[in-house]
Amino acid sequence: MKPFPTIKYATGDATRPVSDGSAVIVHICNDIGGWGRGFVVAISKRWKSPEEAYRLWHAGNGTPFALGEVQFIEVEPQLWVANMIAQRDVRRTGGAPPIRYEALRLALSKVAAFCAEKEATVHMPRIGCGLAGGDWAEVSRIVDDELGAKGISVTVYDFP
């Protein structure tokens, strides 16, 4: 499938985004409070605060911890990590993968609003396509609809 024109692809580490200004690193979290596999390992190696904030959020501190919600953590000046809850549990249920596309759409709409306010670009791995079991064709369509179509620059990193 041909990549969407609003998504740029790069080889590199999504935890080290290439940006001239404000940037948001987005990734998918599950709705059961689990953190420790997948892209979050790379995040935790760079910064402790996204995991700490996620665990506090799951414990009931802050906005509701539910599918479609997003938590923004500033990890460096002009750099945020967006913990997006778009994965139901960590295992397939009834043959369905853990990713929830509608929750991803809702979360990305919140990311778009945040990025518009901060004049930030978005950086990510191929979210939702590893442990969450999603299909990149579907995920990239949602990314394009919710971010690219709203003028938000998106870079997807493939780790070398």
Question: Which positions does each model-derived feature cover?
Answer:
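Macrodomain-like recognition of ADP-ribose-binding/processing modules
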Residues: 1-160
